[in-house]
């Protein structure tokens, strides 16, 4: 319906609504009022829909009017833009001291031709916007891969070369996934966004778009499959049924899925087993990463210990390194500036902290240095096991006997209080734990004895003046319990004194 018909219908509906409202105010019976109220609601809803339709028609007319006026403005702006670019191109060709040319001076033919070329290239770059191409991508480990992408718009590099911004169609990780808010112009994170805002690549590096060839996919072949998160993960086809592919992802965190043909494509890098000559001669495989065969690799300065542990495994580590472009004998990294020798594994003691492990390694290092600086004779004498005592001779025996016969010197086998105190002062961790255990047991015995004493005292209170024999027996039992309590308290005080002495030594020696 056009605008006039909608306005006429809207006036008719409003007039009918006024008549219904007048009828409701006339005081009809309940059944008629219910019908009129329902009719009133329907008319209001119809009026709202008609007003919305009328508003959309008016908007479309305004937009068409603006579209008819805008081409003239766009043509003028485009001509001004081309003129500004031509001036920028002419500026580098002029001498530094003659930035302003005199009137009537001739323009060099080279600058004119370059300006014309620039004017011819700009429309081409604008035409590339929205086109599908095969664009390069450098992975995190420096491997060059070509992904199918779409051109978003033209960009200008720092050196002035022609570049375009592309968005990859088959993102394999989150940094390649296009940001949905960037496409709408609403992303607030800009360069700090986790998703891709496009990558600027040179126009010279672009290649023609390659349609995925699904005819190569069959049961058991490797592929890239689209997951629910929007990323394309490496997988392997387990079944094909009427255009539906059952895939099992390489990652154990992803479940098996059934996808259609638009959610699967061949892998970006094939598992080629051909020689390097055939790889360079085949132009169809130019979009894949270069695979270096182990048979043609020079070992260089790397030692033979590199990847030596793979004699016990399937060698998947070195195969992955080769697929990522690593060449044996060279350093790691994109420019081969990394380390060459492998990192040796060090087995650390179980249940020890990192500080304790570092201390053990330092002791081993110092012991090895001391052993290397020691003379050969001393090294042989130091090779005796630590548990074996040193050899004894006659003089050691005589010295022990003479020292034991000196008056005032305690015997080596007698455990005197002074020796006990000294040993406790230098007590080890296990001795301190045993001391704490003894103190805990003594406190439990004291509590048990105190409960027994209270029970005996209650029994004495009950039997006072009744049974003399029972009272005497309870009195004797009470005295024995009190003596035992005194001994336990003395033992507790002695253990507490030893514990304080050990704590004092620990506080004075630990910083």
UniProtKB/Swiss-Prot annotation:
G-patch domain sequence ranges: 313-359
Transmembrane segments: none
Modified residues (Phosphothreonine): 280
UniProt key word Heme: no
GO biological process, one term: negative regulation of DNA-templated transcription
Comp. bias (Polar residues): 98-115
Skewed-composition ranges (Basic and acidic residues): 491-511
Region (Disordered): 92-129, 266-291, 363-393, 490-511
Covalent S-S links between cysteines: none
GO MF annotation: an example: DNA-binding transcription factor activity
Residues that bear Phosphoserine: 70, 276, 353
InterPro entries recorded: G_patch_dom, Znf-CCCH_4, Znf_CCCH, Znf_CCCH_sf
N-acetylmethionine sites (modified residues): 1
Subcellular location, principal: nucleus
Acidic residues compositional bias, start-end: 116-127
One of the Pfam families matching this protein, by short name: G-patch
Swiss-Prot/TrEMBL keywords: Acetylation, DNA-binding, Metal-binding, Nucleus, Phosphoprotein, Repressor, Transcription, Transcription regulation, Zinc, Zinc-finger
Zinc finger residue ranges, C3H1-type: 174-200
Subcellular location per the Swiss-Prot or TrEMBL entry: Nucleus
Subunit organization: Interacts with CHD4/Mi-2; the interaction is direct.
Stated role: Transcription repressor that specifically binds the 5'-GGAG[GA]A[GA]A-3' consensus sequence. Represses transcription by recruiting the chromatin multiprotein complex NuRD to target promoters. Negatively regulates expression of EGFR, a gene involved in cell proliferation, survival and migration. Its ability to repress genes of the EGFR pathway suggest it may act as a tumor suppressor.
Protein name (Swiss-Prot/TrEMBL): Zinc finger CCCH-type with G patch domain-containing protein
Annotated organism of origin: Mus musculus
């Amino acid at each position: 319906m056009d605008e006039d018909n909608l306005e006429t219908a809207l006036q008719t509906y409003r007039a009918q609504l006024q008549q219904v409202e007048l009828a409701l105010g006339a005081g009809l019976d309940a059944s008629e009022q219910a019908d009129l109220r329902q009719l009133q609601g329907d008319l209001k809803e119809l009026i709202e829909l008609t007003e919305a339709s009328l508003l959309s028609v008016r908007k479309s007319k305004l937009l068409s009017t603006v579209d008819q006026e805008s081409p003239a403005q766009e043509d003028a702006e485009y001509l001004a833009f081309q003129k500004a670019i031509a001036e920028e191109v002419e500026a580098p060709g002029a001498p530094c001291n003659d930035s302003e040319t005199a009137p009537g001076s001739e323009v060099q033919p080279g600058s004119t031709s370059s300006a014309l070329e620039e004017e011819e290239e700009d429309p081409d770059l604008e035409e590339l916007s929205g086109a599908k191409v095969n664009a390069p991508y450098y992975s995190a480990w420096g491997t060059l891969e070509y992904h199918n992408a779409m051109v978003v718009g033209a960009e200008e590099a720092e050196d002035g070369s022609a570049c375009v911004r592309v968005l990859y169609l088959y993102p394999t990780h989150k940094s390649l996934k296009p940001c949905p808010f960037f496409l709408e112009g609403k992303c607030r994170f800009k360069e700090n966004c986790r998703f891709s805002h496009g990558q600027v690549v040179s126009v010279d590096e672009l290649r023609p778009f390659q349609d995925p060839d699904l005819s190569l996919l069959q049961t058991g072949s490797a592929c890239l499959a689209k997951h629910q998160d929007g990323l394309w993960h490496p997988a392997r086809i387990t079944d094909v049924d009427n255009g539906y592919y059952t895939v099992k992802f390489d990652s154990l965190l992803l479940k098996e899925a059934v996808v259609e043909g638009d959610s699967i494509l061949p892998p970006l890098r094939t598992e080629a087993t051909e020689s390097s000559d055939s790889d360079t001669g085949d132009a169809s495989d130019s979009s894949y990463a270069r695979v270096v065969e182990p048979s043609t690799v020079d070992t260089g300065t790397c030692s033979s210990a590199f990847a030596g542990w793979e004699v016990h495994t399937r060698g998947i580590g070195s195969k992955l390194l080769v697929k990522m472009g690593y060449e044996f004998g060279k350093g790691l990294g994109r420019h081969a500036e990394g380390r060459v020798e492998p990192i040796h594994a060090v087995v650390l003691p179980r249940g020890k902290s990192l500080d304790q492990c570092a201390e053990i390694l330092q002791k081993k290092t110092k012991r090895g240095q001391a052993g290397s600086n020691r003379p050969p004779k001393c090294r042989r004498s130091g090779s005796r096991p630590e548990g074996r005592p040193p050899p004894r001779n006659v003089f050691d025996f005589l010295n022990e006997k003479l020292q034991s016969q000196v008056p005032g010197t305690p015997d080596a086998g007698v455990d005197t209080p002074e020796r006990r105190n000294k040993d406790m002062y230098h007590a080890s961790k296990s001795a301190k734990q045993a001391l704490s255990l003894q103190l805990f047991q003594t406190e439990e015995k004291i509590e048990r004895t105190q409960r027994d004493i209270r029970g005996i005292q209650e029994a004495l209170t009950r039997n006072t003046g009744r049974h003399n024999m029972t009272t005497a027996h309870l009195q004797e039992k009470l005295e024995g319990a009190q003596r035992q309590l005194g001994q336990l308290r003395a033992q507790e005080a002695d253990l507490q004194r030893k514990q304080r002495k050990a704590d004092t030594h620990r506080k004075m020696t630990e910083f």
